[in-house]
Amino acid sequence: MEERTPLTMKDIAAHFGISVATVSRALKDSPRISVERRAAIQQYAREHNFTPNMIAESLRHSRIQPMKVIGVIIPEFAHYYFSSILSGIEEEASAHGYRIMVAQSNEQYEREVKICKSFYENKVCGIIVSQAKDTHRYDHFQQLIDTGIPLVFYDRICTGVNASRVVVDDYMGAFNAVSHLIETGCNRIAYYGSAMTLEISKNRYNGYKDALLKHGIQPDPELVRLCDNRTDAESITPEMLNSSAPPNGFFAVNDDTAIGILYTAKCMGFRVPEDISICGFTNGQRAVACDPMLTTVEQRGTKIGEEAADILIGHVEGTIPPGKIERRIIRTRLIIRGTTR
């Protein structure tokens, strides 16, 4: 898709100064379009090697469905949260007679672009995707939409593309977690989060900040760190805890980061939760495998996957009207365990 951008019905429509619907009818030889206009559009399409997504078209307009394959892009296979989402997608897709084709972006923009191209060439009937951390341009997503392939974002949504999405309520999840830390005695709470280029990062940070302000605590920039994995957490936490005004609470953007904080604090001789409290965000399997078990925000990954697949299938089969953008928000739940008082 990078070397030669596929011609889309939108491009043809722009060339002739007509609507995409008119182009679609002309390519299907509809008598509603004049013979001359049909011939001109069809010739232009042939000359420019236009290839419509026939699988998506057949699914959208016919009960005969020869190939029902959904492309799924996940950032990391190893992450429990994304694995649970994938499980939800597969269950919902299978229940409707669809198979899934899965690829991992490994948090790399270039790899994500290649996957989109591969899915396009393999004629998937729709794509469910969570963008990579490294993604900084969105042309590859827009091109898919322009070629008529339904696209649904989950978790990490792309605000630069008008497409359906399923997200958790990151703001309230963070707000409730930080409020719990404050209400159980913490007044200096550190925030470990991802880059603010991601919408989920902005929402979680705003939830953290607003919880502090609601409880009369002024946010301290010195307590905010760009850190979203265990390795980095173990590296930067000693400096934080050895500072002249150390935090007595931590809110981390995911469980792995929170567990890195927990491990480091215990190695330094701090008692958890007596000396410091820690809260994560995911509620994966590792949250109950650490000592003490982790207080965390449950994201309900399986539910996210089910909803994303439900929307995608709705777009493909036409039960969701063409052009309608579905936005679904999944509520979080605070799971209180041993790392908070």
Tell where the protein language model's regions lie, with residue ranges:
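Flexible loop/turn connectors
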Residues: 236-341
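N-terminal helix-turn-helix DNA-binding module of bacterial transcription factors
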Residues: 1-64, 341
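An alpha-beta-alpha
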Residues: 175-217, 222, 322-339
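Short beta-strand elements in bilobed, periplasmic/extracellular small-molecule ligand-binding domains
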Residues: 93-104, 191, 209-231
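N-terminal helix-turn-helix/winged-helix DNA-binding helices
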Residues: 2-8, 46-81, 85-87, 96, ...
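Hydrophobic alpha-helical segments within soluble ligand-binding/sensing domains
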Residues: 164-191, 203-210, 230-239, 258, ...
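Flexible loop/hinge segments that line or gate small-molecule binding clefts
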Residues: 107, 130-176, 197, 256, ...
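Short, solvent-exposed amphipathic alpha-helices that sit
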Residues: 80-95, 173-177, 199-218, 260, ...
